[in-house]
UniProtKB/Swiss-Prot annotation:
Keyword field contains Ribonucleoprotein: yes
Family: Belongs to the universal ribosomal protein uL30 family.
Annotated GO biological process: translation
Gene Ontology cellular component terms for the protein in this record: cytosolic large ribosomal subunit
Top-level taxon in the UniProt lineage: Bacteria
Quaternary structure and interacting proteins, as annotated: Part of the 50S ribosomal subunit.
Name of the protein in its database record: Large ribosomal subunit protein uL30
InterPro entries assigned: Ribo_uL30_ferredoxin-like_sf, Ribosomal_uL30_bac-type, Ribosomal_uL30_CS, Ribosomal_uL30_ferredoxin-like
């Protein structure tokens, strides 16, 4: 299955609590931290909710 690399590019400070919880649930802490996750509907939904805070790349 394909994987995606999610990088936190903007701070969640001052954002809604749901968005901050989503950032933590993805395993992102500090700015420019990255995680590699499986590309599935659940991950895509989480990324869409915080798309203004992260960048997403496909990993082969």
């Amino acid at each position: 299955m394909a994987q995606i690399k999610i990088t936190l590019t903007k701070s969640p400070i001052g954002r809604k609590p749901e968005q901050r919880k989503t950032v933590k649930a993805l395993g992102l802490g500090k700015l420019n931290s990255s995680v590699i996750k499986e590309d599935n509907a659940a991950m895509r939904g989480m990324v869409t909710a915080i798309s203004h805070l992260v960048t997403v790349e496909e990993v082969k």
